[in-house]
Amino acid sequence: MSKQVQDAYIVAATRTPIGRSHRGYFRNTRPDDLLVKALQAVLAQVPSLDPKAIEDIICGCAIPEGPQGLNVARIGAVLAGLPTSVGGITVNRFCASGLSAIQMAADRIRVGEAEVMIAAGTESMSMVPMSGNSPSLSPNMFLNDENVGIAYGMGLTAEKVAQQWKVSREAQDQFALESHLKAIKAQQAGEFSMEITPVEVTDRTANLETGEVIAKTRTVSLDEGPRPDTSLEGLAKLKTVFAARGSVTAGNSSQTSDGAGALVLASEKAVKQFGLKPLARFVSYAAKGVPPEIMGIGPIEAIPAALRYAGLKQEDMDWIELNEAFAAQSLAVINTLKLDPAKVNRMGGAIALGHPLGATGAIRAATVIHALHRHQLKYGMVTMCVGMGQGAAGIFERV
């Protein structure tokens, strides 16, 4: 007997600040601990919810090994003090892992298999490098010349996009500058305060002469990446790092980062049962494949599909969070789809704010949901390119 599809509502959404990898806030903080911070904070937003009603936790993680291996979703659930009856599964669609976690959680509710779910994402690029610790790509991949692009470094794919879509170095640097300017302006205006959960971190320094270790604890509540001193002149001085005569630099690429985000999703039945207040309805999701060597164009395919599934038009979108993996691919997407620049990344993007890979989808979803409420807008979208040639997009409606 078929079940009627029901709506899935986001009733709570939060994230940690985003720290710079290796030398930043969370360089010594494990990714499972970051996840715990996000889980505990998001559940604190819905105190009337019985944790035993949570069916499962789905957590995105792009490189699920080392400190974020061994099913970090289940580990996070246990460390966060959730009932042992709450399951946990870690999912990996690289940069779209967190967004895919939201889609999977929503679908469980929409088909009637769950009343309450948690979707999350966590990533520590300080502790687990983007390439992983011991990657091993099948040698069979190189038997066909058409498959070679699957092994390209992300920066090289951005160079290819810049060449094919004719995105100049000057345009990329200008886009990067605007990302920082928008992020700084949003921070100064307190625009991120609703979505960010402050996190305590402990810094330890050692006296080399005495061996004494001094620990200092502080609370961080802002993303660490935005740089007030960013300028076109400074960006123009940076050398290209992926191609000798290229245009992609560290300055017009996303930052490697650490962070986590989490959302609570509930059915209409659970909303009424526990007295929850919906923030948004999950509307649609699409993931599409593209040639791996130009993976940055993924949103060009995913965005129209997500809109089609939702029965909406591009102009219906009021707020678009387009992950800035690289300025080159961001501009290629914006120009090809003719996205309204005024609606895209109004508070900056990954070039300024950072990109903790598998956590980014959950983090950007928290951003768009709270932004829709702050500005009384209706529809928002989160979209990103995905390594090895994919794109993903998800649409949310303010309730």
What residue spans do the PLM features occupy?
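Active-site-proximal alpha-helical scaffold in enzymes
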Residues: 91-123, 162-192, 262-269, 334, ...
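N-terminal extracellular/periplasmic Venus flytrap/periplasmic-binding protein-like
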Residues: 15-17, 28, 32, 37, ...
